[in-house]
Amino acid sequence: MPHPPIIIPAVGKGEEAKISKTVNAYRKAAELIASMKPETILVTTPHSVTYADYLHISPGSSAKGSFARFGAPQAAAEFTYDTEFVAALTGEAKKAGIPAGTFGEKDPSVDHGALVPLTFVNEACKSPYRLVRCSVSGLGPLVHYNYGKCIAETAEKLGRRTVIIASGDLSHKLKVDGPYGFAKEGPEFDRQATDAMKSAGFMRFLTFDNEFCEAAAVCGLPSFTIMAGAFDRIALQTDFLSYEGPFGVGYAVCAFTPLGKDESRDFGSQYMEYRHKAMNKRRGSEDAYVRLARLSLESWVGKGRRISAPEGLPDEMLQKRAGVFVSLKKDGILRGCIGTILPTQENTAEEIMRSAVSAGTRDPRFSPVAPDELPDIVYSVDVLGAPEPVSSESELDVKRYGVIVQAGGGRCGLLLPDLPGIDTVKAQLHIAMRKGGIKPSDSYSVERFQVVRHT
């Protein structure tokens, strides 16, 4: 289910008529939920507190929510939490090795990602239910899928008649005049996602490319993936109720009803096999730069030893010096990135080896890479050209040039070129300055550089 606040009459004030398909579909879905007389409704929402490496579950016995931040404080509701379910789910997740629980609450109020669908449910559902509100995280798709399995196991063990609502919009980049603009990936994501909903082909939720999703500005995918896991190895009846995007954001409503066991729908195992094959293919096509970065980190993390430059490296790696950045990703999500603007080692090979180890163990944004993560790490190596000063933004190009912003006190921020989600020079400079602790009002200089990227 999507969660546009404008669909609530007190917020939309008539504008909700422009998404009448979604309104009507919401009412049908709410009536279906009401007919099931659920004891517990679990909502997955991307707008509760989120963490990169932790799946938050709202704590406490009850909570209130309103649309005050959207100009309608009178549109409000209060909910009773299913504390027994929350405790049991936390335990199931712990047994599965999934970091989830009630720690880290910041705002106890019910967010609009949950409040929008529950407003419709409350209109249709006259029997009382208890709520479980689950956030998403920056962890990979398999973690979210397995978390969904924990939700289903919890409901079964407690004997709870449970409905899961996967709250999330699709792409936010469907129209040039929309609030987030247009990207060609937007309509394509929505097409593929709605096809997956119509066919209950949940494998697609697990295999979307992360950079593609960033370009499409996707909101709901982790929610959908948790829901998919809750229906692991279960045959489904699918009722695709609506899709539209008149405001530039994709809204889809789809209902799934379990029909019984179906072992062929074990998408978690299928995804692991898919990922294994894809990684083997990637490892087989590595060039010398990427292979050296991988071997360096694997030796340090796995054996505690730094490697020497292996025989057979290209002359350019041994005879030239350059700044190097090594980036690590896991499940398409950044896992570490460290490097040097100018060369600090004897040659490019030594620069790669040192930066690879640092990216995996010394990036302050992340915990060090663990040995069991090594098979899932994807490496890229950027070899930097010499920086050159620029005097205006017209000399910059986010696809072609990286930027270095420097200010007094040794402050320096660097951003590599051609990064997903960074489409303008202003955004590129803003991020580089933020990384360097540089304010727009400070006196600063800008340099540009090109890279040769090895992936």
Language model regions located:
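Short, basic/aromatic recognition patches
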Residues: 281-323
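Active-site beta-strand/loop microenvironment that shapes enzyme catalytic pockets
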Residues: 135-189, 328-348
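Catalytic metal-binding/acid-base residues of hydrolase active sites
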Residues: 47-49, 170-171
